[in-house]
Structure formats: C-alpha cells, structure tokens
C-alpha cells in the first residue's frame, strides 16, 4: 500500500515534513488510480474520508478530544463528503460558549499546521448562537451550514447546531428557495446565460456542478432530502432522471479531477491550456485539435443536460414550495394542449409518444400565443421521455414535416419557438444533422460559441432585422429583410449553414447538399431548394470578399457579381452574412465591417443593374472622381492650374482607388503643405468607412510600411487596410485604415499626439526593427502554421500573396520589414484577424516593378516563415 491510513500515524509521523510526504503519497496514489480508470466517485469520496481520518488524528494529537462542548465540523463541499485534489477544506470549530484564550491559541496552532501542510483550509470559529445569527443574515453561510457534518468532538454541540439549522425560523423554505433561484440567475448572468463559454468554469457555468448543488440545497431545505438518491425516493426525480444527473455529475467530476491533477493552485476554469492536458488525461486523442474538440463536445452536451434538468426540477419545486401544489386555472387551446398561467401543457399524459408530430404543434402554439412563455414541467418531463423513446427522427414523419415548414414560415417562430426547440432537444430530435452539431466546438479564439449555439444566435440576429430600432446598427438588412417574400428560405439556410461542421471535408459543400435534400423532402420547389443550397454553399463568400479582397478593384466586383448572379441572391446573402458575423463573436461586428459589406453590397448591386456585360469604364470613373474633387477644391479657393500641377505628379491609380471626397481632403492639405521635405500626416476627424483614415505623404524610404505599422502597433492601434501608392516623382501617398483596440475609430483627442509620433519616425528615416515580444496568455496554447500562398490573378504586373500566421504582437511590422529586406514594393494590404489567426492579403511587385517570379516567391515564403518563427517560436 503506497500510503498509510492517518488514523494509525504515530507521534514521530506528526511533523510537517512527515505529514506532507504522507499527503503527497496519497495524492500520487489517487492520481495513478485515476489514470487506471478507477471510478471518480470513489476517488472524490475517498479523498474526503482520508481527510476525515487525518483531521481526527490531529484533533487527538492536540488533545481536543478532551474538550467539553467543542466540535470540529465539515461544511460546504467537504460537508457533503466531496473533495477533489485542490478543493477547499471548509471547517467550522463549533462551541457552545466562546473559547477561552488558551483553547483559542491551541486551535490557532492546529489551523496553522494545516496551512503549513499546504491544504486549502477555509475556517470559522463560532458558537452555535453566532452560527444562527450569521447564517440568518448570509445565504452562503446558511447554505454551507446545511451541509454540516460532524468530524470529531462534542456530539451534543453539533446536535444543537442541527436543531438551529433545521428550524423553520432559520431560513423559511420559501424564502430560501427564492434566494437560491435568484442567486443562480445572477450566477448564470455572469456567464452570459449560456452553457457555452470558450473557457468554462466547471462549477459555476450554467449547467455546471453548482446547478446540481442548487437542486440538492433546495430539496434538502424543503423536503429533507440529503442526496440525489433521496430526491428520487421522494418522487421529485424519476429513476431515469436520477441516473442521468448522477451520470452528468460523474463526468463533470472526472473533468474537474483531471484539471486539479494538472494545476498547482485551486481553479475550476477549463482554460485553453488546460483543455489540452485534460483531454489527454481523459483519453481523448485525435489529429490536431480533434481530441480537445471531442472532449469539449461531451462537456458541453453534459452541461446542456444538467441545465435542462435543473430548469425542469426548479419549476416542479416552484409549484410545490411556493404554490403548495395549487395550480392556476387551465385555458383550453385545443384537444391536445392547454395554457396554465404563462405555461403550455399537454392535456394527455402520453400525447407525444402516441403522436410525436404534436411536439411541433406545441411550438406552433408558443409562436402564436404571446402569453405563453415556457413549457410546464410535467410536459417537459413527458417531452424528455418521448424524445428518448423515438425510434426515428421526427423529420421522417410526413405530418411533422408539414408542421416544421409551417413553423419556419411563422412570423414569430424566430424569437418564440426555435430557441426553445433547441433548448428542449427538439431540433436534435427532428434533424440527425443538428444532433451531430450539438456541443460541437472549435478550439480557437474566433468561434465563441458551439456550432449549435451559434446557429441559434444567427436566427435571433435575423429576427432583429425586422425591428426598425436596429436600423442604425444594420441599415441594409433592416431595409431588405422586411421586403423579402420568402423569409423561410433564409431561415432554412441559417439552420443548415454550419451543419456540416465536425465531419471532415468542406462543411459548406456538405451542408448545401443536405439542405437541398431537406427542402425537396419538405415540399419546397426545386428553385427554392437550389437557392437555399446556394446560400449554404456560399455563406462565407461575401465576408471573405469584403474583408480579404480589394473591393475597390472593378474586376473583384465583377467576379463577385458573377457568382451572385442576381439581386435576390445578393439580398438573401447579405442578411445571412451579417447575422453570421454577429452570431460568431459579439466583438466581431463593428462599423468597419458594416462599411465594408455595405460598399461591396452597393457596388455589386450597381454592377448587376448595369449588366455584367457592361463593366465600369475605368477611365470614366477616374474622370468622374477628378471632376468632383476639382469642384470641391475650387470651392476651397484653389485654382485649376494649381490643381492640375499637383495632379500631374500622381498616377492614375490614385484617382481610381480614392473617392472624390478623399482626393479633395488629401489635396487641400497637400496644396497648403509648404515644406515638401517634411512628412505630411492626416487623420480623418470623422469615422471614414467605419475607422480612422491615416494619410501619409512623404519622400519614399526603405521599410516605410514596416515603420508606420510598428508605430501604430506601439500605440495599440490595428491596421485593417492599406493603400500604398507612389507619385511619379518619388513620394508616397499611403492610406491606412486604422481601428483602436475596441474596433472603433480613434478618439479625436488622440489625433495630434499620433500625428507627432508618426512624423517623428518618418523623419528619423531608419527602418524600425521588431524585437520578439511575449505572446499574450490567450494565444500561448494555439499553434498556427505560417502559410504563404500566391493566388492566381488577372494582373500580369502584380503578385497577390495570402499570408496566414499566429496573430502575435509585431507580426505586421515583421512582414513589412521582410518586404523591405527583399526590396519588394507593397501596393495594397487587407489585414484580417480571425481569433488567433492573422489572414492577410498583400499586393506586391519586385524591384523591377513587375510580378514576382517563382524563385522570388519561394525566397519570400522562406524569409517570412523564418522571421515569424523568430517572432513567435512556440507558435509553429
């Protein structure tokens, strides 16, 4: 036996060092037992029993067993008899009278020894009367005392405490129940009321261990049930529900035990770093991040099950505790359903098993009746039972298919039905593909939610487009969506857009094929099915084009318009795209992205209306911009001759890639800029295209792009777009679109300081060198292979390079410095950050002003990979 029972410890063994060794030996033993797949329940309870014996032996050693009316009591989780390797050990030293100074000093020595053993001790020294007084005023103390368990000492003193705790005046069960429900709501709100968080807390996240504890606390206070098993004996849990809760608790315990093995100090957060190790400890393996994603999928599914049971059982408790079993009067809806208060309930005990399609009727009623807010607990229980006994998915039933399409077409279903259908497992029971994505996560910083939660949020965002109050945030979608005749096609595309994830291959292709089959199976016409399938297949097309292509290039617009083909598709696609971005990550949507998508939408709309066979005449566009800008400049008092002399220095590209207002703004300051040897730096006072435009005019110099972006990076500013242009006489006319750390335009009170800093580094004239910097904690555990690809382009003069890497500090400046090192000219850049990944696009030429040859491309690829590795060695 690798460790000794503490009860047999002799006095020479009761030293700090000896006890530390014993504890370490026991912990190592349990660790090995865990790796040998020993039941985690035995380990958790066994650790508590070991601690009981140790404390009992030390209590004896200090001579406390001779004290009268003093007890050592376990409270909280330890009181339940549950200890994980790093759990707090909550102790109460209980007495009938205040302790004498001598005894108090001895108790202090006892506690000091426990701390010296590096045990996480939480303690209180109180009389029974003090416990009663503090417990009445503090819900947390009252809850901990409920789970009090005598370890050693005076039984009579402990009995007096139990009498106080169990008295109705201590915490009346109705008040205790309401307080615990309120506490749970507040806790859930801290986690955004979702079971899906990137780095979840095993205890406190919705559906976590605390939700199981809440059920136990309420049942113990009102019904006297001291365990989940006793709750089933009292009839508040069915045998199946009891087994399910125990199974969920067991899984969460295994995750927590594995986490505590990995940690050195107490924590219940499953951070990215620890997800990697916990997945290995639990036996989840796979290529890349597959093992982590499999483990987290089971974790999130477990949270969903606990959350569902918690919600149902609290409703049952609500009726039993607050209403004394009394019910509101039933209002008949039809033969199958009735409304009682704000809840819908089935009128027949086996309705869903006899006619499963009526499950969908229930949600149709919820969509149609604004007074119905939720499902009655008995009906939830019936639904759970029927769901488990289904021998085939609901979509195979013709009657269910009719009702599902009716739901999709219902104007209130988006906000009244689909979220509830998901929470109650009905979407998973309807569609096998949906069942596969429940709990499916992606191990990255970009996708904040699991695939199913993201899809439900996408539906909610589509609903927001019907509300005129959201026009400022979503101007295009709020104008388009109300006019869309067949909104059900957009909703079906939303349901299927990510449904192919987690199965290997292109999820857009997989989802498109399955969406088409689903539409045909559900009686939609072939053209309708084709439109839904096209939307699913191309749901990323618009965001990728807007964020990673040069949308001011007429060829890019024509290429995009050819893929879209008509305005109807464009309108559906922009609504799906905006909702998709908003539902992926709350921080993704900002005025910059809104402006990009708007420009792409309107440019494409104009191209489609003009006809794809009639592309924009570049010379006509340049002429138009010059005429409009010239008119604005003449209003400022400049002569046509002054304007003409300045413009003769510019290449045609300048007038093509800027609006007439930008041209007028630049040139107003250039014509007033007296000393051309000094740099001119301008910042737009109003948000331009959703960000701040930084315009730089200066003599061309080596590594200018790298110098500018390094300085912007130092000021915590992010470059999202860059137009790099040279005049005919050796000056640069560079434009950077910049956002602050919050994705907003730079505040005006920062403008002058930023201008001074940029002028200083430009006058200094020396390329800025980037030193390796510490990778932020949230990036340290991600591996992103640096990729450099050269994309096909119609241009015979320029190279289009796509660059992917871990988004480490100084990355963009390092890329710019590499271009300068190889004597390459940068003409444009599109900078996109997707979670931990930088996915950037650069337009380049070589020293001769032509596109790179294969040898130059390979040299550039090697240098970029080398320099990025130096910047972030652990990222590769």
Curated annotation (Swiss-Prot):
Intrachain disulfide bonds: none
Segments for region (Uridylyl-removing): 333-692
ACT domain mapped to chain residues: 693-777, 800-876
EC number from the UniProt entry: 2.7.7.59, 3.1.4.-
Positions of transmembrane segments: none
Domain HD residues, every copy: 451-573
GO biological process, one term: regulation of nitrogen utilization
Primary role: Modifies, by uridylylation and deuridylylation, the PII regulatory proteins (GlnB and homologs), in response to the nitrogen status of the cell that GlnD senses through the glutamine level. Under low glutamine levels, catalyzes the conversion of the PII proteins and UTP to PII-UMP and PPi, while under higher glutamine levels, GlnD hydrolyzes PII-UMP to PII and UMP (deuridylylation). Thus, controls uridylylation state and activity of the PII proteins, and plays an important role in the regulation of nitrogen assimilation and metabolism.
Family: Belongs to the GlnD family.
Record's comment describing the protein's domains: Has four distinct domains: an N-terminal nucleotidyltransferase (NT) domain responsible for UTase activity, a central HD domain that encodes UR activity, and two C-terminal ACT domains that seem to have a role in glutamine sensing.
UniProt protein name: Bifunctional uridylyltransferase/uridylyl-removing enzyme
Organism name: Vibrio cholerae serotype O1 (strain ATCC 39315 / El Tor Inaba N16961)
């Amino acid at each position: 036996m690798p460790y000794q029972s503490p009860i047999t410890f002799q006095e020479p063994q009761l030293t700090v060092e000896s006890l530390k060794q014993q504890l370490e030996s026991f912990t190592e033993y349990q660790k090995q037992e865990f790796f040998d797949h020993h039941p985690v329940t035995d380990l958790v309870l066994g650790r508590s029993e070991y601690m009981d014996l140790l404390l009992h032996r030390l209590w004896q050693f200090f001579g406390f067993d001779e004290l009268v009316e003093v007890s050592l009591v376990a409270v909280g989780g330890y009181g339940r008899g549950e200890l994980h390797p790093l759990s707090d050990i909550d102790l109460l030293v209980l007495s009938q009278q205040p302790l004498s100074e001598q005894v108090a000093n001895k108790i202090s020595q006892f506690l000091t020894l426990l701390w010296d053993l590096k045990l996480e001790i939480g303690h209180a020294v109180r009389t029974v009367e003090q416990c009663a007084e503090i417990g009445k005023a503090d819900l947390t103390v009252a809850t901990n005392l409920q789970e009090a368990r005598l370890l050693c000492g005076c039984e009579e003193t402990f009995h007096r405490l139990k009498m106080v705790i169990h008295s109705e005046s201590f915490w009346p069960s109705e008040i205790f129940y309401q307080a615990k429900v309120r506490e749970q709501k507040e806790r859930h709100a801290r986690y955004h009321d979702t079971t899906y968080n990137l780095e979840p807390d095993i205890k406190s996240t919705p559906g976590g261990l605390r939700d199981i504890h809440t059920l136990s606390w309420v049942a113990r206070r009102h019904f006297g049930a001291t365990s989940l098993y006793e709750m089933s004996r009292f009839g508040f849990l069915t045998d199946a529900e009891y087994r399910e809760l125990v199974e969920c608790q067991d899984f969460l315990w295994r995750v927590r035990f594995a986490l505590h093995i990995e940690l050195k100090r107490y924590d219940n957060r499953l951070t990215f770093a620890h997800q990697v190790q916990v997945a290995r400890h639990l036996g989840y393996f796979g290529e890349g991040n597959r093992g982590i994603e499999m483990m987290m999928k089971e974790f999130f599914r477990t949270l969903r099950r606990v959350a569902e049971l918690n919600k149902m059982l609290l409703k049952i408790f609500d009726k039993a505790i607050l209403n004394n079993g009394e019910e509101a009067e039933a209002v008949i809806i039809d033969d199958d359903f009735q409304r009682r208060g704000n809840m819908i309930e089935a009128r027949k005990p086996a309705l869903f098993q006899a006619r499963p399609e009526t499950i969908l009727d229930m949600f149709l009623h919820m969509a149609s009746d604004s007074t119905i807010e939720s499902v009655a607990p008995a009906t939830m229980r019936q639904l759970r039972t029927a769901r488990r006994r289904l021998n085939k998915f609901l979509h195979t039933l013709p009657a269910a298919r009719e009702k599902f399409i009716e739901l999709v077409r219902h104007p209130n279903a988006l906000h009244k039905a689909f979220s509830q259908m998901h929470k109650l497992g009905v979407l998973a029971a309807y569609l096998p593909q949906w069942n596969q994505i429940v709990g499916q996560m992606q191990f990255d910083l970009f996708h904040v939610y699991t695939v199913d939660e993201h899809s439900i949020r996408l539906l909610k965002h589509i609903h927001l487009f019907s509300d005129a109050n959201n026009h400022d945030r979503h101007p295009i979608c709020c104008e388009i969506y109300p006019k869309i005749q067949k909104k059900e096609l957009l909703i079906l595309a939303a349901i299927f857009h990510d449904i192919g994830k987690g199965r290997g291959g292109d999820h857009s292709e997989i989802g498109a094929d399955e969406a088409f089959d689903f539409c045909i199976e559900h009686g939609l016409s072939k053209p309708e099915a084709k439109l839904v399938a096209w939307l699913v297949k191309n749901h990323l097309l618009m965001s990728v084009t807007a964020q990673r292509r040069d949308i001011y290039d007429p060829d890019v617009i024509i290429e995009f318009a050819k893929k879209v083909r008509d305005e109807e598709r464009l309108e559906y696609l922009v609504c799906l795209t905006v909702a998709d971005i908003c539902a992926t990550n709350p921080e993704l949507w900002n005025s910059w992205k809104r402006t990009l998508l708007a420009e792409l939408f309107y440019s494409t709309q104009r191209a489609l209306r003009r006809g794809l066979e009639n592309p924009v005449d570049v010379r006509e566009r340049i002429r138009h911009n010059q005429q409009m800008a010239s008119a604005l400049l003449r209003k400022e008092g400049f002569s046509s001759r002054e304007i003409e002399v300045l413009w003769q220095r510019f290449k045609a590209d300048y007038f093509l890639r800027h609006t007439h207002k930008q041209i007028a703004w630049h040139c107003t300051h250039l014509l007033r800029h007296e000393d051309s040897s000094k740099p001119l730096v301008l910042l737009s006072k109003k948000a331009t295209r959703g960000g701040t435009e930084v315009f730089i005019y200066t003599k061309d110099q080596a590594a200018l792009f790298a110098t500018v972006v390094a300085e912007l990076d130092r000021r915590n500013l992010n470059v999202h777009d860059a137009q790099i242009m040279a005049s005919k006489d050796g000056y640069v006319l560079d434009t950077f679109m910049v956002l602050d750390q919050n994705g907003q335009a730079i505040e005006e009170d920062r403008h002058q300081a930023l201008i001074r800093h940029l002028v200083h580094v430009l006058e200094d004239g020396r390329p800025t060198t980037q030193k390796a910097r510490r990778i932020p904690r949230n990036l340290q555990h991600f591996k992103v292979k640096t990729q450099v690809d050269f994309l096909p382009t119609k241009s015979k003069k320029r190279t289009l390079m796509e660059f992917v890497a871990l988004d480490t500090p100084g990355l963009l400046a390092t890329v710019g410095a590499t271009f300068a090192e190889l004597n390459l000219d940068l003409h444009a850049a599109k900078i996109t950050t997707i979670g931990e990944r930088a996915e950037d696009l650069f337009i380049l030429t070589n020293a001769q002003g032509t596109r790179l040859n294969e040898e130059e491309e390979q040299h550039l690829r090697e240098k970029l990979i080398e320099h990025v590795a130096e910047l972030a060695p652990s990222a590769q």
